[in-house]
Amino acid sequence: KFLVFIMMFFLFLNIFLLFINRWIYNNFGNVKIQEILFTLLSPTSGTDTSLIYSFILKALIPALFIVVISFCFLLFLHKRLNGKILKLLKITCSIFVVSTLLLNVFYTNSRYDIINYLNYKNQKTTIYNKKKAKTKKLSEYIGDSSIIYQNPQDIQITSESSNNLIYIYLESIENSFMDTENGGIKDVNCLPELTQLAKENISFSNTDKLGGAFPFTGTTWTIASMTAQLTGLPLKVDVANDMDQQDAFMPGAKTLSDFLHEQGYIQELMIGSQKEFAGTDKLFLQHGYDRIYDYDTLKEMYSYHGNNINKWGFNDCQLFEFAKEELTKLGSTQNKFNFTLATIDCHTPDGFTCSNCPNTYKNQYENIYACQSKQVSNFIKWCQEQDWYTNTTIVLVGDHPTMAQSYIKDIPSTYQRTTYNCFINSKIETTQIKNRQFTHMDMYPTTLAAMGFKIYGNKLGLGTNLFSKLPTVIEKYGLDYINEEVQKSSEYLDENIYQFK
């Protein structure tokens, strides 16, 4: 009986792990262990409940069902087979279950890079142990090549005149959905308006066509991407656990929004989902933002059409209308503002359609991408008609490559997937926009430069001002090297930036 119990337990683990791997792949694509751990440890408030139901229906219940059927079948055989044959069958089944479980564990490790994650956790990096740079005049200073990390607390940032900022995180918008002529992989461009905006304004690219930021450790899911763009640092899994225990989100970091708060900017975040999800409220409210308009507050403030709500919250078509009303209020004041918006319609696994979505592409997801492109373009046109536009810089950034795995199967393995970026009405120009290697961490200093700020040394965190002549950290040191180093432990970061207790 004990052997049967152990065998059934291992069988359950085996099948459950198999279904978990399949479920994660279908819903989130090729994620690594950092993303999984952060999601599990983060506050769950605001999570799409359909994901939880999907996990139960497609992973837990099938595994339990197979184990129950197997147990019943074993009982059936137990009554009909003699002792020797039954014993041999049990041993054979046990060997099969244990061996396949081991193979499953090895596969899971290779897929999520678990052993490497644990190995890196036990190693220490020195890329954050910076030395003080010699003081030089801003006009003469081009950066100290021996320093990789620059703590924004120590950096001088000045401006004679700076713009307002509208910063839009575009959910899952990557360049592969453009046509091949413009740097994507599609026969027909799913992002025609965003493509045109990128051509007419400033868009940094990893190729000689349109392109963008490389996916990078600690930046490839929404809250991680937001953190990287605000702090110039990748997000560590430990932050999720710290939020639960200490209610803190990188308290020692000086973010883009912390700096703008010091400059007197009014700062607001508008999202269609709930602000508590993954600690979004803590990241923004603890770092200079005055208020957050989320699903709960927006539905109390404004009237809306009932069809414009999805499983996460408000559809983007409704969110852009809310944004126009709030920007009209902000624009009527004498204060400079930073208005941040985050879209949701292109969220995995299938996106969310609205009444504005076309039906001209080959699948729903491509239609939603096209819809997003059109809506963003219309919103930008509306902004350009407002009195405050001449003093406002608009930044569009895809938060991470899409996780909707079923819609990206046609992407060649040789194609480098990158996220979209576009700087509109920048106060600074550059011709060095093609064949760049950069990550979301570079958005921090680059955004400030686009607004009209001068950054002493052109580096903040691990980010480099792309408008400067300096190479980014991955251009100088290589993507693989920096990718490995940021996964290692750092006492400097833990004590000074994350301030773990």
Residues covered by each model-derived region:
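Transmembrane and membrane-interface helices of multi-pass
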Residues: 1-124
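Solvent-exposed soluble domains appended to multi-pass membrane proteins
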Residues: 146-501
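Exposed alpha-helical structural elements
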Residues: 35-36, 84, 137, 193, ...
